[in-house]
Amino acid sequence: MATFKKFNKDKRPKRNTQSLLFKRKRFCRFTVAGVEEIDYKDIDTLRDFISENGKIIPARLTGTRAIYQRQLNTAIKRARFLAMVPYSDQHRV
């Protein structure tokens, strides 16, 4: 017969309580600014949504609405193809 260990609450890893208390409310920058379409030539805006290693940051982290996230993905991919934005962190522009 198998024996079961009781789960001890004291041995659980403690979460950082400060990070749970001070969560910033995410909002869509494009909705607030009234942007109709995201342009692939606006490199400064696109770089805000690309991580250090060159990946596109997901909408659940940035707070971008779905319609703008799709436009953002397309714009970043176009800018990469035209060598305006690097594909990875190993390519410096």
Swiss-Prot record:
One of its GO terms (biological process) is translation. GO terms for cellular component: cytosolic small ribosomal subunit. One of its GO terms (molecular function) is small ribosomal subunit rRNA binding. It holds the Pfam family Ribosomal_S18. Transmembrane segments: none annotated. InterPro entries: Ribosomal_bS18, Ribosomal_bS18_CS, Ribosomal_bS18_sf. The keyword Chloroplast does not apply. Keywords: Ribonucleoprotein, Ribosomal protein, RNA-binding, rRNA-binding. PANTHER family: 30S RIBOSOMAL PROTEIN S18, SMALL RIBOSOMAL SUBUNIT PROTEIN BS18M. Belongs to the bacterial ribosomal protein bS18 family. Binds as a heterodimer with protein bS6 to the central domain of the 16S rRNA, where it helps stabilize the platform of the 30S subunit. Part of the 30S ribosomal subunit. Forms a tight heterodimer with protein bS6. This is Small ribosomal subunit protein bS18. It comes from Variovorax paradoxus (strain S110).
